[in-house]
Swiss-Prot record:
Organism expressing this protein natively: Pseudomonas syringae pv. syringae (strain B728a)
UniProt domain Core-binding (CB): residue ranges: 1-85
Tyr recombinase domain ranges (all copies): 106-285
Disulfide bonds: none
PROSITE patterns from the UniProt entry: CB, TYR_RECOMBINASE
InterPro entries: CB, DNA_brk_join_enz, Integrase-like_cat_sf, Integrase_catalytic, Integrase_recombinase_N, Integrase_SAM-like_N, Recomb_XerC, Tyrosine_recombinase_XerC/XerD
Location (main, coarse): cytoplasm
Protein name per UniProt: Tyrosine recombinase XerC
Keyword check for Cell cycle: yes
Function according to Swiss-Prot or TrEMBL: Site-specific tyrosine recombinase, which acts by catalyzing the cutting and rejoining of the recombining DNA molecules. The XerC-XerD complex is essential to convert dimers of the bacterial chromosome into monomers to permit their segregation at cell division. It also contributes to the segregational stability of plasmids.
Amino acid sequence: MDQHLDAYCMHLRSERQVSPHTLEAYRRDLGKVLAYCQKAQVSSWSDLDIQHLRSFTARQHQQGQSSRSLARMLSAVRGFYKYLNREGICQHDPANGLSPPKGERRLPKTLDTDRAAQLLDGGVEDDFLAHRDQAILELLYSSGLRLSELTGLNLDQLDLRDGLVQVLGKGSKTRVLPVGSKARQALEVWLPLRALTNPQDDAVFVSQQGKRLGPRAIQVRLKAAGERELGQNLHPHMLRHSFASHLLESSQDLRAVQELLGHADIKTTQIYTHLDFQHLATVYDSAHPRAKRKGTADD
């Protein structure tokens, strides 16, 4: 079995020309599978089956391997068996149809309401970039837009009189969202400045040369704003997450938040209920007279 693994690594290096880092990762992952085979008395790669791999991945998961790492291992096994089948050594793939154990879903990072206010109420310098960036920040937080929805936004999608914006979301689905008063004010300041650039199209947010802002440009500007006002990294989706979390915290209306975010499946929206519970738990721990406090003895 060792010689087949060595031959595969040689194939990756010479014919596939993978990087040394990638090659080392493949060798390490497949080496763990080989070690398992030796302990499980699997004497050839032909004898390794899906039940063996299920046992292997379960054991690795119990030992602390993340779902992402296990997915990478299974990908390495599939690539290895594709090679073995092509070389006539095996006629099967034990990893076919096998998925790694699901890990805990990471909670999205958000700003609390005080930090959001600190970001948005920090004061705006009277210049083109500052007013544009303020309008971007306010709209992202006010309406919960995705970055792609913001960059694709055109003038005819804005209705500042009624405080509405129409966006084109995933799957080319449109939805109409409210625009808060602060965002409306910021946009009313920004749009006359935008017109001075002689814009090349109907994009709401443009550069000083009148070109539509792309995702990367907005990410860079938000990162700078976060470091300046909050001393932390800030990305567009953090404002969308904050919008959803704060709205759910205040309204407790999961369906309404789902509609505003444009989620096809409410399960996607339910991640924000975990954030809300975390907030409530923090409030409870700090405010309830019989909550456990750090540094106090149990009575």
